Design a protein with these regions (language model features):
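Short, well-structured N-terminal submotif of metal-dependent ribonuclease cores
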Residues: 1-33, 44, 49-56
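Extended beta-strand/beta-hairpin segments
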Residues: 2-6, 91, 122
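Alpha-helix boundary recognition
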Residues: 23, 60-64, 84, 101, ...
Length: 131
């Protein structure tokens, strides 16, 4: 079983495309995933990109995804260290990277710039690896 850390962009795409993740994989994410996906969908509604009922349907699909959410003190401490190491003011992305280091085989993100910035720190995989 391959363990993947998935970020909010990946989860939102999986929900919008109604993709079923292979049962051969285990998905992990920091607890902040809930707030990030909620906010991203609300913002999309406010910008007129999607209807509110579509956003709520995607939130329901996200809530049913078998993603193990983690946010313990060890993760937070490692995220802080990584943010310092990488020169990031925010620890949001560092939480995903830290979780990958601590518990997963690879990190899946749609953010090409983020993926480049963590080369050599954690392995990354494409969203297609989840199918």
């Amino acid at each position: 079983m391959t363990k993947f850390v998935v970020d909010a962009g990946v989860v939102l795409q999986l929900a919008s495309e109604e993709v079923e993740v292979s049962g051969a994989h285990k998905l992990l994410a920091p607890t902040l995933l809930r707030s990030q996906t909620l906010s991203a969908l609300h913002e999309a509604v406010q910008r007129g990109e999607i209807e509110a009922d579509v956003a709520r349907d995607r939130l329901t699909r996200i809530g049913k995804m078998p993603i193990r959410l983690l946010g313990d003190a060890v993760l937070r401490r490692r995220a802080w260290e990584l943010a310092d190491q990488l020169g990031w003011a925010s620890t949001y992305n560092a939480e995903y990277v830290a979780l990958t280091q601590l518990q997963a085989d690879a990190f899946v993100t749609l953010d090409a710039e983020l993926a480049r910035s963590i080369e050599g720190i954690v392995p990354t995989a494409s969203i297609d690896a989840l199918r």
